[in-house]
Amino acid sequence: MDSMANTVSSSVVNTGNKPSETLNKTVKNYTPKVPYMCVIA
């Protein structure tokens, strides 16, 4: 879980235009049952 959260955070940090859109794509790439989607988004 920690490594996944770090990857998601890195994706958001590296994206300056639409971080929320990138976050949604990143979360969906991992699994549709990720609780972080509700916590971060």
UniProtKB/Swiss-Prot annotation:
<dbReference type="GO" id="GO:0032005">
    <property type="term" value="P:signal transduction involved in positive regulation of conjugation with cellular fusion"/>
</dbReference>
<keyword id="KW-0449">Lipoprotein</keyword>
<feature type="propeptide">
    <location>
        <begin position="1"/>
        <end position="29"/>
    </location>
</feature>
<dbReference type="Pfam" id="PF03855">
    <property type="entry name" value="M-factor"/>
</dbReference>
<keyword id="KW-0346">Stress response</keyword>
<feature type="region of interest" description="Disordered">
    <location>
        <begin position="1"/>
        <end position="25"/>
    </location>
</feature>
<keyword id="KW-0636">Prenylation</keyword>
<dbReference type="GO" id="GO:0007267">
    <property type="term" value="P:cell-cell signaling"/>
</dbReference>
<dbReference type="GO" id="GO:0000772">
    <property type="term" value="F:mating pheromone activity"/>
</dbReference>
<dbReference type="GO" id="GO:0005576">
    <property type="term" value="C:extracellular region"/>
</dbReference>
<keyword id="KW-0488">Methylation</keyword>
<keyword id="KW-0964">Secreted</keyword>
<feature type="propeptide" description="Removed in mature form">
    <location>
        <begin position="39"/>
        <end position="41"/>
    </location>
</feature>
<dbReference type="InterPro" id="IPR005555">
    <property type="entry name" value="M-factor"/>
</dbReference>
<comment type="function">
    <text>M-factor is a mating pheromone produced by M-type mating cells. All three mfm genes contribute to the production of M-factor.</text>
</comment>
<dbReference type="GO" id="GO:0062038">
    <property type="term" value="P:positive regulation of pheromone response MAPK cascade"/>
</dbReference>
<feature type="lipid moiety-binding region" description="S-farnesyl cysteine">
    <location>
        <position position="38"/>
    </location>
</feature>
<protein>
    <recommendedName>
        <fullName>M-factor</fullName>
    </recommendedName>
</protein>
<keyword id="KW-0588">Pheromone</keyword>
<feature type="modified residue" description="Cysteine methyl ester">
    <location>
        <position position="38"/>
    </location>
</feature>
